[in-house]
Amino acid sequence: MQKFIIHKGIACPLEYANIDTDQIIPKQFLLAVSKQGFGRHLFHDLRYLDDKESVLNMDFNLNKKEYQNSSILVSFENFGSGSSREHAPWALVDYGIRAIIAPSFADIFKNNALGNGLLTIELAKDEVLEIVDELKKSQDKNIEISLLEKRVFFKDKIFSFDLDNFHRICLLEGLDNIALTLKHEAQIKAYEKNSKSFLV
């Protein structure tokens, strides 16, 4: 998993509340078990005008020239609602999204996202609206995020956010669940060696 310490990138506003996991990655694309290849299907029903993904919907912000190569999304409340599918953060990460800023996230999506290296940043609704309005007006659409400082830098504004220490350390060190387990491999083996078996 890629480390997240400081990231600067183009931010794209998605002015929708309650974006659910089926909108993020529709169910017909969930057949694969690898984390790669889902990015092309991200927001399928919003990004494309046809099922073959050959005609882009140019009214959708991610398809607009100024938001191409976006690595940060700024959206509205309850992002990631709906069914629990880890493919949703897989699709976002595979597309190149490193962070999402919103007033709130669905709990399961948030945990899945953080576990896959995707930073979820919760800001007050008025702060999110301020960022969205400025993104639409400004030619410079770059936002800088410091996980070390837990701050978002945009124009001359600084927005502070909170994140629990466990997920913060995992992101800073680039540790997913498997890497985190392997980090404690010696202790696990020592425990298994010294623990008594209850099988007879």
From Swiss-Prot:
Functional summary from the UniProt entry: Catalyzes the isomerization between 2-isopropylmalate and 3-isopropylmalate, via the formation of 2-isopropylmaleate.
NCBIfam families the UniProt entry points to: leuD (TIGR00171), PRK01641.1 (NF002458)
Catalytic activity: (2R,3S)-3-isopropylmalate = (2S)-2-isopropylmalate
Gene Ontology CC annotation, any one: 3-isopropylmalate dehydratase complex
Organism of provenance: Campylobacter jejuni (strain RM1221)
MF annotations from Gene Ontology: 3-isopropylmalate dehydratase activity
Enzyme Commission identifier(s): 4.2.1.33
Oligomeric and partner information: Heterodimer of LeuC and LeuD.
Keyword set includes Amino-acid biosynthesis: yes
InterPro entries membership: 3-IsopropMal_deHydase_ssu, Aconitase/3IPM_dehydase_swvl, AconitaseA/IPMdHydase_ssu_swvl, IPMI_Swivel, LeuD
Family, similarity comment: Belongs to the LeuD family. LeuD type 1 subfamily.
One annotated GO biological process: L-leucine biosynthetic process
The entry's keywords: Amino-acid biosynthesis, Branched-chain amino acid biosynthesis, Leucine biosynthesis, Lyase
Pathway given in the UniProt record: Amino-acid biosynthesis; L-leucine biosynthesis; L-leucine from 3-methyl-2-oxobutanoate: step 2/4
Disulphide-bonded residues: none
Name recorded for this polypeptide: 3-isopropylmalate dehydratase small subunit
